[in-house]
A protein has these predicted regions:
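Short hydrophobic "strand-cap" motifs at the C-terminus of beta-strands
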Residues: 10-13, 42-44, 74-76, 131-132, ...
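Nucleotide-sugar donor-binding and catalytic loop/hinge architecture
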Residues: 22-39, 63-66
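Conserved donor-binding/catalytic core segment of Leloir-type glycosyltransferases
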Residues: 34-50, 56-59, 71-74
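Short donor-sugar binding/catalytic loops of nucleotide-sugar-dependent glycosyltransferases
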Residues: 43-47, 62, 77-79, 134, ...
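Nucleotide-activated donor-binding/catalytic signature segment of Leloir-type glycosyltransferases, i.e.
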Residues: 84-138
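Acidic donor-binding loop of glycosyltransferase active sites
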Residues: 142-159, 168-171
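Short acidic/histidine- and often glycine-rich active-site loop of Leloir-type glycosyltransferases
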Residues: 165, 178-190
Length: 190
């Protein structure tokens, strides 16, 4: 032994509570929400590090070349979820403000982060379905079942629950090469 401890990689667990619902009416959901044949999914809290500001312009490039694609953006804008009247929110905001001064560059501040404005700026409102709210567990399946691929264009990565949910639905993952993604997202496999 060289005195070094072994390294064990632990990945985000797969949530077995999220799985396809048999006989779910995918075509009706697509029709109601104006979705095309091929649907890409951005799911989860809208946070700057998750790269939605990169997803929307990239999708726009694809949509300029194809008329059979749609993008679903499904998730809450993180900073809009905080109740400013609560003491816990004031404490969190204060701690984040202190941490921000110590660790973050000014460009990393996401309190005013609004990538959804890009949809209108690019004129792709008819190609993007936005569900900017909390999604209860029993409704998660809908967004994954109607989609063909999950998009994880993170600027930096932490273990991703969205990635794990995508695996339950046997979906391809389109991801940036950051964090653990190069180890868990294999080209041609998932």
């Amino acid at each position: 032994s060289n005195g070094q401890l072994p390294v064990i990689n632990l990945y985000h667990p797969v949530y077995d509570m999220f799985k396809p619902v048999p006989n779910y009416d995918i075509e009706t959901f697509k029709a109601v929400h104006g979705l095309k044949k091929h649907v890409f999914l951005f799911f989860g809290f809208i946070r700057k590090y998750k790269g939605l500001h990169n997803v929307i312009p990239a999708f726009n490039l694809l949509a300029q070349k194809r008329d059979d694609v749609s993008l679903i953006i499904c998730g809450e804008s993180f900073w809009k979820t905080l109740d400013k009247s609560k003491l816990s929110t004031r404490i969190k905001t204060g701690l984040f403000g202190l941490a921000k001064k110590i660790f973050l560059k000014k460009s990393d501040d996401e309190s005013e982060y609004n990538p959804l404005a890009l949809i209108e700026e690019l004129g792709i409102q008819d190609k993007v379905a936005v569900f900017n709210s909390f999604v209860p567990n029993e409704e998660v399946h809908k967004y994954f079942q109607v989609s063909d691929a999950v998009i994880l264009f993170y600027d930096y990565a932490t273990p991703s629950g969205v990635e794990s949910i995508g695996y339950n639905f046997q979906m391809p993952i389109l991801a940036t090469r950051v964090g653990h993604f190069p180890e868990t997202v294999v080209d041609g496999y998932n």
